[in-house]
């Protein structure tokens, strides 16, 4: 039986201090989300400013949600579509020329439902080069998708 009052996020789990986390969430909710669709370089700049590794000519829409950008790598010419969620509790790597379409959910984190305190955990996700994840694809923690794969 779970006792959720004992839940806590392990020290260092987020990969950054609380101030940086809160600052990113404020920037994402304003400067990132309110930017016009065509301002891809602006959003790439914001992500790089928070530690993301972003390749050249990346297309990332303003409605994309990224939990911790310092755990994100996007290869050259990668696209991330409207309303996609990159839940970066663990590392997410998206290869060059890969497409993560609208409303996809890449989820690196979960909970151990068997632990008394519902312990949180994370595993990386790797999307290879020239992949296409079509609309509404869910990718679970620890999944690696090979180069050239189409899912949807």
Predicted regions and their residues:
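Left-handed beta-helix
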Residues: 56, 61-62, 67, 75-76, ...
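Terminal amphipathic alpha-helical/low-complexity segments used for targeting or macromolecular assembly
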Residues: 1-52, 56, 130
């Amino acid at each position: 039986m779970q006792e959720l009052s004992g839940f806590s996020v392990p020290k260092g789990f987020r990969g950054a201090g609380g101030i940086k986390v809160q600052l990113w969430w404020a920037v994402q909710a304003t400067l990132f989300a309110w930017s016009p669709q065509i301002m891809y370089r602006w959003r790439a700049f914001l992500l790089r400013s928070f530690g993301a590794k972003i390749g050249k000519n990346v297309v990332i829409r303003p409605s994309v949600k990224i939990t911790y950008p310092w755990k994100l790598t996007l290869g050259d010419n990668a696209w991330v579509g409207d309303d996609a969620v990159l839940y970066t509790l663990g590392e997410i790597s998206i290869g060059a020329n890969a497409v993560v379409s609208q409303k996809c959910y890449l989820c690196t984190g979960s909970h151990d439902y068997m632990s008394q305190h519902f312990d949180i955990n994370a595993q990386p996700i790797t999307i290879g080069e020239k992949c296409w994840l079509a609309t509404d694809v869910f990718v679970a923690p620890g999944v690696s998708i090979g180069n050239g794969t189409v899912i949807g």
